């Protein structure tokens, strides 16, 4: 009997080892191999001259301008370190506005003129590269006859080594810009937004500082990203044209058993998947990515892996690298990793929770309630600032998670709704309510929190329950933004968060600075907090965000309900948004408008691709199958009639009629979709 391709694929699965590929774990401990392929502080100390090492560390730790005089020395040390691992090439690794990573690789060799070659790597080659900027999304900033672009070394994110079966490449994280200086990537505005946040956050901290208290020299955002994904055997994946082209199924029947019994979440991980995860963890640890957690997610074949938090630029780089490695390691295990937000209809989709906090170079988490009055006052100001920022810029925050894939996920009972709201937890909400009401204190475990002269309940570290329906939830010492999609870069949500928080902190700083110094500690700062919370309390919601009643309540409060990507993108070019990014030098008007054009075009192209794939599958797979079924049924009906006259064949006739009607409906749907899709896309400009 001849097997169908699907039957052959399923049969092959039965003979695959359930434990997957065995990973050869090195004899050394994790602590010895962690960061082994990263040009980290230990490698820098070993390979750099002492004075160069100190200057480079000052740039990295304090955000100081890089001293150009050390570039050659750093480049040579980086090259020597990489060559010691067998590296032959280097690349400037950047994140264009495709949502993926990009690079161009060059070798270290320099011909000597005598038929030999030496290995060289100059400071100029380290600090600047020159890729073609017109072949990547630019929103009209770069075109084919104006194609020059530059990559610039980002010393804040360490260089690392990428291994392939036939070699090793030194990979250098970089920013990407045009010849005119316009940012063409996601990293550049993230770095700029961190600088804006640093200025305004230190301004507020200086206003709160006590005599003799050490002052922060640098403030920055920290992020921990929870990455969700699906796994499928590669043989089954390649049987699906829709999954190959779109990353999700466009057609299909629901399985007899999905996630109804809630028996997959946190269940024992299958051996083959666990082998994949262990192999992936080893690669991640060697690259200095602090992966911490692994577990089954809610849907069958869905999983999650999450790292410990890092500074926002490094965290975003590491998440992009992790997504690359998810695909690479899955391939080695005969699996395919699906990062689409909704690969299967009827099953939970995948997200990427963005855990956001703000820290200082002194080790303080400014979103931690703390243990004394000074820390609690600082916490309440930064908490208030972020609440105000989210309320004022709901549209921007919603736009950061707008995509064709995420539209299938947001608003279903598996992810936060499209309405942005903030959850604080009952205890902290009580503190906020007491402040707004002007009450001197409330009760919480019998303790009190002192804000200058007034008292409020002492805040325990775990002040919240977990409201998994909330898009923006406080979780004890950070905010968890739960709306980002699993496949997206986290740079966009985080440079928006940094920028809107910087604006909010500046507003609060101006209000405090306007107070007489004697009044600041005598209830003045508390009044600023109260007035700000009163103005923005509408964004706070402690209940079920899935409930229909919340949609109605949100409308009464004047909150935005941007249900899909077109609605969210429709507000991006509002004057207030353009002015915000220009004010804090995060993005110019030209840069911002180019991004909105790119996001809109990406959304439309995604839908066009899905439409073309749907037409192709329907016309070449389903329609012929329907015609074959019709022919087979008609032959069967004719044979039955010829074999015995007088048989009751109503059921068979109805079945044949149903098949014929379905074929007719399918052809009409194909024609209609072709008509709505319109003409095929114009061929792109030739690229030299």
Where are the language model's segments positioned?
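N-terminal hydrophobic targeting/anchoring segments and the immediately downstream early-domain regions
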Residues: 2-27, 144-152, 158-160, 164
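Histidine/acidic residue-rich metal-binding segments in metalloenzymes
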Residues: 15-123, 127-146
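Short, solvent-exposed linear motifs at loop/edge-of-secondary-structure regions
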Residues: 63-64, 69-99, 220, 225-233, ...
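Residue-level "edge-of-site" marker
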Residues: 72, 95, 124, 296-297, ...
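Short linear, low-complexity motifs centered on an aromatic residue
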Residues: 99-114, 128, 133-134, 240-242, ...
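Short, intrinsically disordered, low-complexity segments enriched in Ser/Thr and Pro
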Residues: 110-144, 262, 385-387, 509-519, ...
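Glycine-rich, acidic/polar active-site loops that bind/position phosphate-bearing ligands
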Residues: 148-339, 348-351, 358-599
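C-terminal amphipathic alpha-helical interaction region
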Residues: 532-688
